[in-house]
Amino acid sequence: MSTGLTPPPQPIKRPPKAVTWIFAIIALVILIAPMSVGFYTDWLWFGEVDFRGVFSKVIVTRIVLFVIFALIAGFVTWLAGYFVTKLRPDEMSAFDTQSPVYQYRQMIENSLRRVMVIIPIFVALLAGLIGQRSWRTVQMWLNGQDFGVSDQQFGLDYGFYAFDLPMLRLIADSLSMMLIVAFLIALVGHYLMGGIRAGNQMTGQKSFVSRGARTQLAVTAGLWMLVKVAGYWLDRYDLLTKENSTFTGASYTDINAQLPAKIILLVIALFVAIAFFSAIFLKDLRIPGLAVVLMLLSSVIIGAAWPLMLERFSVQPNRAEKEAEYISRNIESTRYAYGITDEDVTYEENWGAGETTNEEVAADSATISNIRLLDPQILSPTFTQQQQLRNFYGFPDQLAMDRFEVDGKLRDFVVAARELDPNALQQNQQDWINRHTVYTHGNGFIAAQANQVDEVARDVGSTRGGYPVYTVSDLQSNARAAESEDAEELGIKVDEPRVYYGPLIASATDGADYAIVGDTGDGPVEYDTDTSSYTYEGAGGVDIGNMVNRAMFALRYQEMNMLLSDRVGSESKILFERDPRSRVEKVAPWLTTDSKTYPTVIDGRIKWIVDGYTTLDSLPYSTRTSLTEATQDAVMPDGTPQPLITDRVGYIRNSVKAVVDAYDGTVELYEFDTEDPVLKAWRGVFPDTVKDGSEISDELRAHLRYPEDLFKVQRDMLAKYNVDDSGTFFTNDAFWSVPGDPTAAEGRQELKQPPYYVVAADPETGESSFQLITPFRGLQREYLSAHMSASSDPVTYGEITVRVLPTDSVTQGPKQAQDAMMSSDQVAQDQTLWRGSNDLHNGNLLTLPVGGGEILYVEPIYSQRKDQASAFPKLLRVLVFYKGQVGYAPTIAEALSQVGIDPKEAQDIEEVDGTATTPSTDETDTDTDQPATETPTAPVSEAEGIAAINDALSNLEAARDSSFEEYGRALDALDRAVDSYQSAQ
């Protein structure tokens, strides 16, 4: 019989403590395991590259900082909670019975012990994680150096601002935040414990603060105000890096109003702190309350209103005169910070003011004979098609420039390493075994003289001519005596042409940048050539022969095959972190690296050269700049492509040259600026990691380049800071700007024109010199104002020359020259005719000072057949602009002749009748083997002529199913065979 009663609810069973602990341990493992795997594999990697000291120093520093910050923050938080519980009222009568806290008093009391543990631990962990990120600041402070240069206001060495001030700021800000947390804990805690009661107007109950609560809050607030006193003192120095509308640094208002205001507020803050401490003994809280009101009013009146009034009524009406001294300080400091002082930069005023004859221009052989026709930004597809060999090899989208001597003369070359392209692997090549154990490395070094092509391309429809003349050193050419001798004569013959490390190799879109190499016991398995395999013998790589290491890397890359595959044996090693720039940044975490990495040949080995910068966030009166914005141009619209230690800088030096071996990944760092105090500080942090500059070999020094990113930053600064008069600086009328790139694709022409590496006449000696150059236009004007060059030659490295054009005459700027060239009748006619079946590419528009006083513009035009996947650019025409005249021809010599310059010094080829050929592409990977298309030589008899025609016909038939380029070459070969036969009759 039902009673109608509802059974009592069953109590919820809690899971056993063992289960809770198991889940907690699993969660902890999931959280810590990835960090542990990364830590262990990185530790192995640093050992491989012999930079484990860097890894250890960084880890130890971060751990120590974590512990220090965690202990201090945890102790301060615990102490605040301890005093809350110690000073809480003992009686329940301390509570307002209407307060919502009243009914929870017992629950709060029961939770005290747990809260006293959880909150300090949480705050400690948070503070430790934040604090350990400041390891660079701490190490710089411990190893700081004097600059030998003092600021213009306080007379303190720049070393104080670079090394000491950031550390003092870190301490002050950290203490301030900890005390704020302690104050909030005390405030909330005493309210919950009944030590603080809000008044109740309905019951007439007054607000109440217990003596204990008043004491704790007053002491905490007083300590915070003392930290604020220190903050006001440090604020004085921060004024020197303040960014104003016209310049960076303390202005007239800052020095005459803000600086005294900081001192006054400092004194007031000290009295406020004393007032807070007085509340310990006085029951009346009105004294600290009035002190706080005084502090706030003083901040508004003295810290804001007074400077504002001085600025409005004294400075603004006379700004040019009032700010003159401080603008001069900004000019001096900025020039020092960016290495553009008068000691670093030579200005040639009124360059070109005199008359320069065409004969003088023609005699400028150092420039005229080295005019660059090959654009490294355009020719990557051409290199790929003609020098790829196999589908899995490739070249970067932007090739590099270097220089070599040819017959005793300096020439610039487009250079590239033939790398493995993991993103080009097809079908079964992408299988894990093939990708990571077979296709492991690239092959060879390619160089093409930048002022030459194989043959003149006069007809846009012909497949002959307009292509680079390559010098190659790879596994295949080393086996052929003639090609090996060519490479050796140029100085690029490599004893070890295999490329295991490079930016393209490391560009895998899935992030799986690694290769597994070593003897597996079954013989060589790595692809080397069509007829041979290879086993890696270099020192690079981390041992994964033991199961622990293998398991760790399997976890790192989430790849089970590492544990199961027979290709991984006891002698196996894993090569990873293969991007040269990333390797340098990892072993030198204090360096910012240049965005351009380039290959060269040193001591018979392919080496990657990486430029490293030491930077500072700011220096007194130095204008700050964004590295991302400064490096943006038409070629790099997004600026430097990798994360930076800091984007905004106020000081930069190219203090380190780094070299990465393409075969074994060895990283070498060389000191390159012996005067840089920042580098000296970092060498103190990481001793024996940077080699002395004296250890740079002559061969390496001959291939060092003035870095592009630094040059871009300096040209941005020189656009303004070429002005040394404060009055002129204030009016802006002598500022320059970097012109846009008129040859860029639609939508990018307003982006800055990139600088170009060229071989041209040295501004001082007139001898051939490898330089980085850029033009300047007037501010918001298109006329040319100046021309800047930086030398890369070993003897004159780093010398910057700025040719300043006369202001009483005008010289056409790059955009005006481009408009004139493209609007000339013949150019416009050809462009209209050719664009139907060809893509036309405007090459680099070079602005070349010639003859000691004239400007010559040169621009190559490239054509590429439309709608053909296998088509690639070739040089079709050369445009020149000189003294308002346009030259337009298939060769630079003809184009120069059209504008009145004798081309006898122009490096040019002779159009060979019937013997010139395009570089062979017979090694290019295809689906079916096709006979190579050969070019017959001129026959000497009727029988030989007939035989040559028959051979050409056979090759034409064989090439029918090949690419358009192969078929076109076969047609050309047939035409030449017929011509040769007819000429022999």
UniProtKB/Swiss-Prot annotation:
Keywords: Cell membrane, Membrane, Transmembrane, Transmembrane helix. Its main location: membrane. The keyword Transport does not apply. Belongs to the UPF0182 family. InterPro entries: UPF0182 (IPR005372). This is UPF0182 protein Cgl0786/cg0896. Residues 929-939 have a biased composition (Low complexity). GO terms for cellular component: extracellular region; plasma membrane. It is found in: Cell membrane. HAMAP family: UPF0182. It comes from Corynebacterium glutamicum (strain ATCC 13032 / DSM 20300 / JCM 1318 / BCRC 11384 / CCUG 27702 / LMG 3730 / NBRC 12168 / NCIMB 10025 / NRRL B-2784 / 534). The keyword Membrane applies. The chain crosses the membrane at residues 19-39, 63-83, 115-135, 176-196, 215-235, 262-282, 290-310. It is a multi-pass membrane protein. It comes from the Bacteria. Residues 904-944 are annotated as: Disordered.
